[in-house]
Amino acid sequence: MPRRPDLNHVLVIGSGPILIGQAAEFDYSGTQACRVLRAEGLQVTLINSNPATIMTDPEYADHTYVEPITAEFVEKVIAQQAERGNKIDALLATLGGQTALNTAVKLSENGALERYGVELIGADFEAIQRGEDRQKFKDIVTKVGGESARSRVCFTMDEVRDTVADLGLPVVVRPSFTMGGLGSGMAYSAEDVERMAGDGLAASPSANVLIEESIYGWKEYELELMRDGHDNVVVVCSIENFDPMGVHTGDSVTVAPAMTLTDREYQTMRTLGIEILREVGVDTGGCNIQFAVNPKDGRLIVIEMNPRVSRSSALASKATGFPIAKIAAKLAIGYTLDEIVNDITKETPACFEPTLDYVVVKAPRFAFEKFPGADGTLTTTMKSVGEAMSLGRNFIEALGKVMRSLETGRAGFWTGPDPEGSVDEVLTRLHTATDGRLYDIEYALRLGATVEQVAVASGVDPWFVEQIGRLVALRAELIDAPVLGEELLRRSKHNGLSDRQIAALRPELAGEMGVRVLRQRLGIHPVFKTVDTCAAEFEARTPYHYSSYELDPSAETEVAPQAERPKVLILGSGPNRIGQGIEFDYSCVHAATTLTEAGFETVMINCNPETVSTDYDTADRLYFEPLTFEDVLEIYYAEQASGEGGPGVVGVIVQLGGQTPLGLAERLEKAGVPIVGTLPEAIDLAEDRGEFGEVLRRAGLPAPRFGMATSFDQARRIAAEIGYPVLVRPSYVLGGRGMEIVYDEETLEGYITRATELSPEHPVLVDRFLEDAIEIDVDALCDGTEVYIGGVMEHIEEAGIHSGDSACALPPVTLGRSDIEAVRRATEAIAFGIGVVGLLNVQYALKDDVLYVLEANPRASRTVPFVSKATAVPLAKACARIMLGATIAQLREEGVLASTGDGAVTARNAPVAVKEAVLPFHRFRKADGSQIDSLLGPEMKSTGEVMGIAADFGSAFAKSQTAAYGSLPAQGTVFVSVANRDKRSLVFPVKRLADLGFRVLATEGTAEMLRRNGIPCEEVRKHFQEFSEGLPQMSAVDAIKAGHVDMVINTPYGNSGPRIDGYEIRSAAVSMNIPCVTTVQGASAAVQGIEAGIRGDIGVRSLQELHSALGS
């Protein structure tokens, strides 16, 4: 049937900030949905708090609200549209992850949808409840003849204890209505049960947890299914987890299609999946169902389902070429599967199930190095921050490609230090899942362990272990062969080995380039295959490619000739990680769309299945490949060959994808690849402290005093000369990796030992640390003759907090005109001094009216999307055009940039935008189960960001906090404990809170200072102080854990008892999910936000309205 005529206006809820467990896959899903709905003639309103997303670009919806995703704010949007006579007919919440689903449930429960006559489409309220509520779902599984793990839903700790007594330990604890396994875990002891179930009851919006028998070690599978209003069902993809049950599927290596299922098991799963889908009532959309199989007896149970588009849906979409989110959106508005045409073949309908003639492997990317002390054990709580995907003609080829796609410094096995230990020690280690288990499996086999021993120890299916065993045998062949001949080299490449891996085993070839030269001499090159959804049964019309090394030398590539248009290759940013997230993907997508419009053929290279850049119709051609020198160069050659007789590849863009492509620029240029925009030598100049310092000296721009050290003695002399505190860091890092503020010589010695291990080929930088300075961030464009300031941002936290973790405001709220003019002059001098062509980000610190240059990055920064949303200027699009020859003057004429002026000086009526970082501290614990410290510093720790935008700073800040962490309290109790240096600065913010009616708790020293300043407060004991006569009975931590505190203000002390006390206070605040402010500036901003909330005048406005006002 055609689309429903009664639907004219649809509200789409996005997923908000990038979190562990809910990442960029929902930007990909939501972007697809918005495009489809608008193409169908529907009016679309979107709400999403994440400015780094493509979906929040104003062109993807009629009304785009960058607002917190809460029931309160969504209702404000619905009400505003209704007041304007523009009633919203339907709410589509199945494409925004768990956040959107939970918000939709609240809007149903509080009556808002009924009040405004808004229908839930995709999955209705009852379907969401049946799919998400553990007990209801278990009942459905039983009804359709399936089996669940023995379990019980518990609402109290007493019920939890009774259930554990019945089931026996170990048990799995799973909260309802959470994502990424938040709050879940394997409990081996009564103490584990108390902690995990307590956390789970707190994490679950419905305050219940499922206590389940342990199925640890079973094999895990997933099915992606879709159903339409006529009860047509398709199984889009089967996915098998390499890791057994007990490891969250988001942290497991996964493989599609499933490799080790028997046909009978698959058919049983398929039948059960379809019956469950029908019974739950997801009648217009997609869902994901997880199963477990006992490898000993074949017992099959159903674990859970997601009645929405999920992380696995994005993976399945990229793995098969079947656009699940796009089709789900069409099904939600009334179409049936047989009416929807497959985009890739342009002739088969969507009711044709995809067929794969290749293997897909996804691997997680972890960031444990960012959280010292965090337990690296993989459990049912997801901990990975990103993922990479690869395609190959066999499992082992795809595995090799995905391992080098993760960008951990290795190119697969044998390209880093071997794991430690004897065969018995490695087998013992394999009983516990960690992020290094692939390397442990290979090493155990290499040391002589049998496939069966490794499979038993790790719980990994013997078939997968056997495949890695084939690589161990191949390694021995490569080492032992007297000469590396064509047959062995071709077989090595067919099995996924990179040139770097082969070079590591054949020293006589003198490195990766030696292997490359040998390959070229022997005529061994990859062929490029096509993802077509139908195993070549029908012709693919969409060029979506992956590489493979065939054993047959006559195998042909499938890259179609295209000689008419000049080609531009865009290097993406690879897997998301802390320091390099979707902000960079945003810039790559903008480059692809704007350059296609400008007449170029755009070619995207990336390996991240979550992103919009790897959608098959973002660029003219897509290569799903690792971002390594070897892989990129082969694509360049393939594209040059396909463009023979025409202009060919005129440029490769490395400036937009973060540090990953920048790291390849120099080698690619030396290999003859044309790099456009800022040249590699200019990129190196900006990174080299000595050369960059010379640029600043010539321009008369001050920078903090610094020195370079390769030993502790050198570092000690430099630190003594410039004075403590100092900021120490290795060079060439993104996200502040390895950075630390050091206050004394003892700490410096420990740091130098660690840092030189981190980056032995580069010296350690020792900078004077500017305490209490205001940090400023600038994004600018330069075409070689003119500089255009995109935006000037003022950081809310002082210098010393990584810019990616600091909240910032645009326009700046305390800088004067003379400060901004100084920023402009400095930015122009730096842009011309380096030789920037494209984007430039500069960070400054303003202290005692002196503007210091901290660093300059001649590339797209993570703030580009935020600045673009706040100012209505598409910086990434302008950058792409400038790199390919356009001038700023030309872009002004075309209306891409403002005809006069730029973003340095904003209009008086310009709204204030606040960007806030989202931090994942609640995801990580130490091995003993205690929280890790939530203190911020120069090393970046945030996974994502939100934006609040309003007429004044207080309202914008309040929105940003609500979007990131939940509403600031309007009343209640605030606990204050601050370092001596901060006490004077905090008098006014705390007095204002007291005046607003807040009860103030404080520790002894802080309480004394507050009372002297006329602020009433109650005293609590420090956590490390034993209770004795004369001390308050309740400690600060006790008060927080008892639920008596609504906000914490705690700035760090030195390294003694109070420092430990501060850690305990902050950890307690994180565990209780209450706001915890760790800087003076943050406290002042929070007070302004609280005042705005109490005033009650925080409204909503769409970006379209805001941008229209900016242009008028």
From Swiss-Prot:
Chain positions recorded as Mg(2+) 1 binding sites: 290, 304
Domain MGS-like, chain residue ranges per copy: 966-1112
Cofactor annotation: Mg(2+); Mn(2+)
Region (Oligomerization domain): 408-559
Cofactor binding summary note: Binds 4 Mg(2+) or Mn(2+) ions per subunit.
Enzymatic reactions: hydrogencarbonate + L-glutamine + 2 ATP + H2O = carbamoyl phosphate + L-glutamate + 2 ADP + phosphate + 2 H(+)
Top class in the EC scheme: ligase
Pfam family, one: CPSase_L_D3
Binding residue positions for Mn(2+) 4: 855, 857
Binding site for ATP 1: 134, 174, 180-181, 213, 215, 220, 246-248, 290, 304
SUPFAM superfamilies: Carbamoyl phosphate synthetase, large subunit connection domain (SSF48108), Glutathione synthetase ATP-binding domain-like (SSF56059), Methylglyoxal synthase-like (SSF52335), PreATP-grasp domain (SSF52440)
Documented EC number(s): 6.3.4.16, 6.3.5.5
Residues reported in the UniProt entry to bind Mn(2+) 3: 843, 855
Recorded domain comment: The large subunit is composed of 2 ATP-grasp domains that are involved in binding the 2 ATP molecules needed for carbamoyl phosphate synthesis. The N-terminal ATP-grasp domain (referred to as the carboxyphosphate synthetic component) catalyzes the ATP-dependent phosphorylation of hydrogencarbonate to carboxyphosphate and the subsequent nucleophilic attack by ammonia to form a carbamate intermediate.
Family, as annotated: Belongs to the CarB family.
Record's function text: Large subunit of the glutamine-dependent carbamoyl phosphate synthetase (CPSase). CPSase catalyzes the formation of carbamoyl phosphate from the ammonia moiety of glutamine, carbonate, and phosphate donated by ATP, constituting the first step of 2 biosynthetic pathways, one leading to arginine and/or urea and the other to pyrimidine nucleotides.
Protein name according to UniProt: Carbamoyl phosphate synthase large chain
Species, as recorded: Mycolicibacterium vanbaalenii (strain DSM 7251 / JCM 13017 / BCRC 16820 / KCTC 9966 / NRRL B-24157 / PYR-1) (Mycobacterium vanbaalenii)
Primary gene name: carB
